[in-house]
A protein has these predicted regions:
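Predominantly cytoplasmic-facing regulatory/coupling regions of multi-pass membrane proteins
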Residues: 1-96, 152-264, 292, 297, ...
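Extended non-transmembrane interhelical loops and adjacent amphipathic helices
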Residues: 80, 92-119, 203
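Membrane-interface alpha-helices at helix entry/exit sites of multi-pass transporters
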Residues: 88-90, 108-109, 122-135, 288-299
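Transmembrane alpha-helix interface/packing and boundary motifs in multi-pass membrane proteins
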Residues: 97-106, 241, 257-276
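Interfacial segments of multi-pass membrane proteins
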Residues: 117-123, 255, 277-292
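Selective transmembrane-helix segments that form parts of the transport pathway or gating/packing helices
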Residues: 135-140, 301-305
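Transmembrane alpha-helix termini and helix-breaking/packing motifs in multi-pass membrane transporters
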Residues: 143-154
Length: 328
């Protein structure tokens, strides 16, 4: 398949319009989450239980923040090996800015990184290719860690088959030139200029993904993923210990990744609600009371998902301010 020129990303005004919609979606999601928490608190004492572990939650921010640095290092390394010079701090701000919209459907809001990395001379399809590779390798890491909690989720085998099947199809399609050539011919016959351009962009991204499918890139990505998700799992275990819950540490290490996997497969934006429910049900199977399980689930999500959104929003403001300074 020939490599056509990259499609236009759209004007700045269009980007701002889309970002406004995505930001409004995340804001409404946050408001709904708070409303549900207030409702759940009646009879469960969730807030009072959270107040008992606020110190553990504050300390948890440190390892969670370290995971962001590891993830950015992977992103920076993947782009650098493709010949791009990414300034460390502006690149970090652009990468973290994607977390502001991580609670959008399929984490698609994280693709706003295209906006910031395009300013550094990185084509949109390359950013998308790295994003897909990062997500796919993280999926394999999460799946591996989830096996530690197999005893509390009898149907894990089905999830394993689904995830492995998806990743194999994704990587197989990217690595199979004949399939991409066939898809390229089909895309040229699609009705509508917009649909053809979208399909063309997707195929170029698949070509970019193919360039990531070497042993060194896969090994580096998996190593970084295991460090990042291992730290996140350890944070969950520490929160359980802080609440005095007696759990097998090895099983507890697998609960949060497995809950994240279930949340992702639920197709609920950010896995909000479904991830928490999965944590509660798994802890219930281990003999933990529902009020305690709810408190742990909420605490874990506050220091992971919602903390990431706050960090992302701050990084987005920094990135936007920096771009205006350059324009001025």
């Amino acid at each position: 398949m020939d490599s056509p020129s990259p499609p236009s990303i759209g004007s700045a005004a269009r980007w701002r319009h889309r970002l406004d919609y995505l930001a409004a979606f995340v804001f409404l999601l946050c408001a709904g989450y708070i409303a549900v928490l207030v409702w759940v608190d009646h009879g469960n004492g969730t807030f009072s239980r959270l107040s008992e572990v606020w110190q553990s939650m504050a300390l948890a921010i440190v390892p969670v923040s370290i995971t962001y640095l590891f993830r950015y290092w992977r992103w920076h390394w993947l782009l650098r090996r493709k010949g791009h010079h990414v300034p460390v701090l502006p690149g970090l701000a652009g990468y973290l800015a994607g977390f502001a919209l991580t609670a959008t459907p399929g984490k698609a809001g994280e693709l706003m990184r295209i906006r910031y990395f395009a300013r550094m001379g990185i084509p949109a399809e390359r950013t998308l290719g790295v994003f897909i590779f990062e997500r796919a390798s993280d999926l394999l890491v999460i799946l591996s860690l989830s096996l530690l909690a197999a005893s509390v989720f009898p149907t894990l085998g089905t999830l394993v088959a689904l995830v492995l099947g998806f990743v194999c199809v994704l990587f197989g399609a990217a690595a199979w030139p004949a399939l991409l050539n066939s898809l390229s011919r089909v895309s040229e016959r699609l009705p509508g200029r917009w649909l053809r351009r979208l399909a063309r962009f997707g195929l170029i991204s698949a070509l970019e993904l193919r360039s990531c499918l070497d042993l060194r890139a896969f090994g580096q990505s998996m190593f970084t993923g295991f460090v990042a998700w291992g730290l996140t799992s350890a944070v969950f275990v520490s929160l359980c210990a802080g609440m005095g819950l007696q759990l097998n540490p090895m099983v507890a290490l697998g609960i949060y990744p497995l809950a994240m996997l279930i949340g992702a497969l639920s197709f609920v934006p950010g896995g909000v609600g479904t991830t928490e429910l999965a944590i509660v049900l798994m802890l219930n199977r281990l003999g933990i009371s529902t009020p305690d399980a709810i408190a742990v689930a909420v605490a874990a999500r506050l220091v992971t998902l919602w903390y990431a959104i706050v960090v992302g929003a701050a990084a987005m403001l920094i990135a936007e301010f920096a771009s205006r300074e350059e324009a001025g």
